[in-house]
Amino acid sequence: MQQLDIAPVQGADHGFDIAKGNPIAMLFGPGYALQTVLLWIVFFCSLMNLFLFAYWLPEVLHLGGFTPAEAARASSYRDLGAIFAVLYLGALIDRYGPDRALALHYAAGIIFIGAIALFAMPYLLLSVVIFFAGMMITGSQTGANATAGKLYPARMRTSGIGWALGIGRLGGIAAPVLGGYLLSLGMHPPQIFFSACGFALIAAIATALLAFRGQRAPVLTPQEAAE
């Protein structure tokens, strides 16, 4: 900048979210430790549930007597439900808060996944149930990202979201491993598919605890924001 004869502006706010210090220490610092643990549980269980749901749905449908083409077509309604969820979830989060909205979605997802695993249904009704299951479970992962963004102040937001996404990916990796292990124990695919409800339940409880705690990103003074 000296060669270009440009003098830097003293004290200018460049808009960068730069957190000083150890990011992990900040995430587990006073006022943030509990919400960080709960958020990590939400992300881990959310992707465990999502991948168990996605991997085993076609097999469950095939064992239910549907042809591979019918199973593939019915599975596609899961993605349509996820797309529809994105369209309205933002407004719902703005109105009720991300944690309350997600807790409700995970709880409803348990009902729809359990119905697919436990009950024989005609194809049309099954397609509708799969649509709502995808809307509640797959679409909620988008809302989980919004939850992470609202729990931390700006100086910690990048670290908070990044670590939560990383923990969630561990759940995505563990899901097929768990499915294979349960299969080796003699569990049938519908039973493995039903196990996804357990992770949805844990995610619902964790998001409900976040809502009950009512923790939000604190308002920082200019001096605190500059640290």
Indicate where each model-derived feature is located.
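Extracytoplasmic gate region of multi-pass secondary transporters
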Residues: 28-87
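Intracellular juxtamembrane helix-capping segments at the cytosolic ends
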Residues: 139-152
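Helix-loop junctions at membrane interfaces in 12-TM secondary transporters
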Residues: 118-128
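Structural signature of the two symmetry-related core transmembrane helices
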Residues: 100-115
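Helix-to-loop junctions at the C-terminal end of transmembrane segments
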Residues: 86-97, 183
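Multi-pass alpha-helical transporter architecture, strongest
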Residues: 195-224
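Intracellular cytosolic loops and amphipathic helices of Major Facilitator Superfamily
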Residues: 1-35, 218-227
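A membrane-interface helix-boundary motif in multi-pass transporters
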Residues: 183-198
